[in-house]
Amino acid sequence: MFRAAAPGQLRRATSLLRFQSTLVIAEHANDTLAPITLNTITAAKHLGGEVSCLVAGTKCDKVAQDLCKVAGVAKVLVAQHDAYKGLLPEELTPLILATQKQFNHTHICAGASAFGKNLLPRIAAKLDVAPISDIIAIKSPDTFVRTIYAGNAICTVKCDEKVKVFSVRGTSFEAAAASGGSASSEKASSTSPVGISEWLDQKLTKSDRPELTGAKVVVSGGRGLKSGENFKLLYDLADQLHAAVGASRAAVDAGFVTNDLQVGQTGKIVAPELYIAVGISGAIQHLAGMKDSKTIVAINKDPEAPIFQVADYGIVADLFKVVPEMTELLKKK
């Protein structure tokens, strides 16, 4: 049975939306914006009201300019200081609190990446509110949806905090359009460096393959590959597909690959156009990290493997025969 809202209720709802304002904490590498920030902006737009982005860094003018062009962003706040090098949460927290004091946002959010998960709990603690982590949908300005029990159950959370602080699962929201916007840009509130931690260095592994969480195609291997050397089969296949390579926790724990390739509840969450699971049985923890993929292909010699329950296409066969055959066929195209 449906019940029509009274005119007064509609006016109050419209008024509430009008006064919503969301601050998105931008994740970036000074010259490039992290893709998850665009997904977070889309989530923020679902709340209604004005969306502002805070960019903190050392030489982040380009990122600020790029954000001004993003559809749906009304304002970009820029803070540049040597203290913000490396985006240390200890230094960013006072900046965000000062920004919140100035603009009185109703919502503060960031992507549910290592950056966001490290920063937002500090913000929430300082504001004395309970944060909401890893949301996958927004029902209203105070009602959010997230998964629990390794993705096997969905929880709807109603938040009555004065400021809603939450992190966004990037794979659950489309990326905001990188063009079409015309946001204004201004300097953010200045704060003194805290100085309790210092950014020293960062060493990035260079790879011709796309980054795992942003790749359109992912080829992942599990314990069925039997050794780290056999992961070369996946690397060869991935090269033909221009894909990223991932792994199950079992493969990581066995020492086959490093943990930066781990896909799953305790690893990285991915949702590519195509996910190929090779020699992966399909533990709940792994499924939680890839079940939102658009198309899932599973290769496993065990027909009872749980991975086939979520796969769109399944190949029950020896991976050591199938994967090289797939690679050779792709080479001939």
Swiss-Prot record:
Binds 1 FAD per dimer. It is found in: Mitochondrion matrix. The modification N6-succinyllysine is found at K59, K69, K85, K158, K187, K203, K216, K226, K232, K301. Gene3D superfamilies: HUPs (3.40.50.620), TPP-binding domain (3.40.50.1220). The modification N6-acetyllysine is found at K59, K62, K69, K75, K85, K101, K139, K158, K164, K203, K226, K232. It holds the Pfam family ETF_alpha. The modification Phosphothreonine is found at T93. Residues 205-333 are annotated as: Domain II. FAD binds at residues 223, 248, 263-266, 281-286, 300, 318-319. Its cofactor is FAD. PROSITE patterns: ETF_ALPHA (PS00696). GO terms for biological process: fatty acid beta-oxidation using acyl-CoA dehydrogenase. Residues 20-204 are annotated as: Domain I. GO terms for molecular function: electron transfer activity; flavin adenine dinucleotide binding. The keyword Repeat does not apply. PANTHER family: ELECTRON TRANSFER FLAVOPROTEIN ALPHA, ELECTRON TRANSFER FLAVOPROTEIN SUBUNIT ALPHA, MITOCHONDRIAL. Heterodimer composed of ETFA and ETFB. Identified in a complex that contains ETFA, ETFB and ETFRF1. Interaction with ETFRF1 promotes dissociation of the bound FAD and loss of electron transfer activity. Interacts with TASOR. Heterodimeric electron transfer flavoprotein that accepts electrons from several mitochondrial dehydrogenases, including acyl-CoA dehydrogenases, glutaryl-CoA and sarcosine dehydrogenase. It transfers the electrons to the main mitochondrial respiratory chain via ETF-ubiquinone oxidoreductase (ETF dehydrogenase). Required for normal mitochondrial fatty acid oxidation and normal amino acid metabolism. Domain I shares an identical polypeptide fold with the beta subunit ETFB though there is no sequence similarity. This is Electron transfer flavoprotein subunit alpha, mitochondrial. The lineage of its organism: Eukaryota, Metazoa, Chordata, Craniata, Vertebrata. The gene is ETFA.
